[in-house]
């Protein structure tokens, strides 16, 4: 994966950095649980990929068993590249690495939103426990420090459809709204300004079919007590200054944040709660048991009664959930700051982040320093999780610039100041899951965020803390607890499925 491009799309050539590679070829089963409601077949890229995988490879799977042996042929590399995103300019100072063998109650693997929030909540609930966070690079190096900065509620799914249990959908919405308020309070308590603004989020609608679906969706959502609004085109244009969309629906409870500054909030909160954080500490091996044994590349061992997997897209490469998660490359770029006069000419009057209704979604945000960032579009998947390349990255950033100019023609000629990419974890049906795995049920996890991670990660951090404390009753009603995720085939069928699905959507997206 190449990231951190200093961009001029008209001049200059981006550079890519080398990274160390580790591998772990174990595979571990996990318990079955409640299944999230699937999204409609016509609208889900993930379902298309899954069906392509079975159609293209199913006969061969049974005939030659390649799907079973391919993990031993193609090891997925565990690549930790430096985070050179715009957000990374605000990365908090790093802690020293682990320098000796230790024994702990809970070891948290990964220093992003999931890991740091889990450490904070575990210590808050169980202050007698020794909790350590082990981060391979610096906190926020992964998806937590590279994302699109939108803080989203869970309003059913982003294709504007409720499940067969809309009352549960409303409870999930309320849970994510409450968490946004908790994040705001936590930021205030630490004294760190993470640029948290809860002035709502917009989904802008691309087609007339999207408009019809959204009107029905908003009507049902409001009947359940969700305060979402349908915005006709004039109101939409007044807010964000573009006429390219048909309409939109607005959620007043969403918002945006500076992701790396939010990482800093969680790092300080976890530290203040008594958690220990070790950075530049890579775990290369995990031995299961009633007491787990973790091995670092520095030669140290960690004995732990419980483990939290907070490794997002890298989770399969640690030997867990190999057939549940795709590590997908997402691309983001940011402009130089605009003056107030320039923003007035562009017409973006309200500082509301928005994303469109396409499957290969684009999303945009207006920062406090008047920069505009745009991300999304065609994601990337490379064979066996390998790194991307300069030509591929440049083509994605060019796509982002074309889309930015399409939305705001006045931005023609504006060059991105910086572009970056990073891998995020996607499940095939965009369903998240939180729970426990392993033979001794002492390995906790949260994954499959599929674009909702800025908010949902710390919801799952709270749930993990409750599970560790044996307090799972309040979460049993939620479909994401121990949810079994749709099957992802091994290579080469994974790559075949991903390329077929992505190519199909590039041809059919409006």
What do these predicted regions represent?
Residues 248-291, 296-298:
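Helical element adjacent to the flavin cofactor pocket in flavoenzyme catalytic cores
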Residues 106-132:
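N-terminal Rossmann-like FAD-binding beta1-loop-alpha1 element of flavoenzymes
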Residues 125-146:
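Glycine-rich FAD pyrophosphate-binding loop
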Residues 146-174:
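Glycine-rich active-site loop/strand segments that organize a redox cofactor
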Residues 189-197, 283, 301-302, 306-341, ...:
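Active-site substrate-recognition segment that forms the wall
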Residues 34-106, 124-125:
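Extreme N-terminal leader/targeting segments of oxidoreductases
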Residues 165-269:
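Rossmann-like flavin
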Residues 382-390, 402-499:
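C-terminal catalytic lobe of FAD-dependent flavoproteins
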């Amino acid at each position: 994966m190449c990231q951190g491009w200093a961009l001029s799309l008209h001049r200059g050539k981006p550079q890519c950095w080398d990274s160390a590679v580790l591998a772990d070829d174990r595979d571990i089963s996990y318990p079955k649980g409640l299944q999230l409601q699937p999204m409609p077949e016509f609208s889900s890229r993930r379902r298309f990929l899954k069906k392509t995988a079975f159609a293209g490879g199913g006969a061969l799977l049974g005939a030659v068993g390649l799907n079973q042996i391919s993990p031993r042929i193609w090891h997925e590399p565990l690549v930790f590249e430096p985070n050179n995103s715009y957000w990374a300019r605000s990365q908090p100072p790093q802690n020293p690495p682990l320098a000796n063998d230790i024994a702990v109650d809970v070891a948290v693997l990964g220093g992003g939103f999931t890991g740091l929030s889990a450490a904070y909540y575990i210590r808050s609930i169980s202050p007698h426990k020794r909790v350590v966070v082990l981060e391979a690079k610096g906190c926020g190096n992964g998806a937590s420090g590279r994302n699109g900065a939108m803080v989203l509620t869970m309003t059913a799914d982003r294709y504007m459809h409720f499940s067969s249990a809309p009352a549960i959908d409303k409870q999930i919405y309320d849970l994510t709204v409450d968490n946004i308020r908790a994040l705001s309070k936590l930021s205030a308590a630490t004294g760190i300004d993470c640029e948290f603004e809860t002035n709502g989020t917009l989904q802008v609608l691309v087609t007339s079919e999207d408009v019809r679906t959204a009107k029905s969706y908003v009507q049902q959502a409001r009947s359940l007590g969700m305060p979402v609004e349908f915005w006709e085109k004039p109101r939409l244009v007044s807010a964000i200054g573009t006429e390219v969309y048909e309409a939109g629906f607005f959620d007043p409870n969403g918002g945006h944040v500076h992701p790396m500054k939010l990482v800093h909030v969680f790092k300080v909160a976890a530290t203040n709660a008594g958690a220990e954080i070790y950075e530049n500490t890579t775990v290369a091996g995990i031995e299961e048991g009633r007491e787990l044994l973790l091995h670092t590349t520095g030669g140290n061992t960690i004995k732990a009664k419980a483990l939290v997997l907070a490794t997002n897209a890298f989770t399969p490469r640690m030997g867990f959930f190999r057939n549940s998660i795709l590590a997908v490359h997402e691309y983001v770029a940011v402009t130089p700051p605009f003056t107030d006069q320039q923003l007035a000419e562009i017409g973006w009057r309200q500082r509301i982040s928005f994303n469109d209704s396409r499957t290969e979604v684009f999303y945009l945000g207006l920062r406090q320093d008047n920069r505009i960032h745009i991300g999304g579009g065609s994601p990337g998947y490379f064979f066996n999780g390998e790194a991307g390349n300069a030509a591929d990255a440049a083509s994605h950033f060019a796509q982002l610039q074309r889309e930015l100019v399409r939305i705001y023609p006045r931005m023609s000629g504006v060059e991105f100041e910086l572009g970056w990419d990073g891998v995020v974890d996607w499940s095939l049906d965009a369903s998240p899951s939180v729970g426990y795995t392993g033979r001794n049920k002492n390995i906790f996890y949260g994954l499959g965020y599929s674009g909702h991670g800025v908010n949902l990660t710390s919801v799952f951090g709270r749930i993990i803390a409750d599970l560790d404390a044996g307090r799972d009753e309040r979460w049993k009603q939620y479909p994401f607890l121990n949810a079994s995720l749709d099957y992802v085939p091994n290579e080469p069928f994974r790559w075949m499925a991903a390329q077929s699905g992505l190519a199909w959507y590039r041809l059919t997206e409006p």
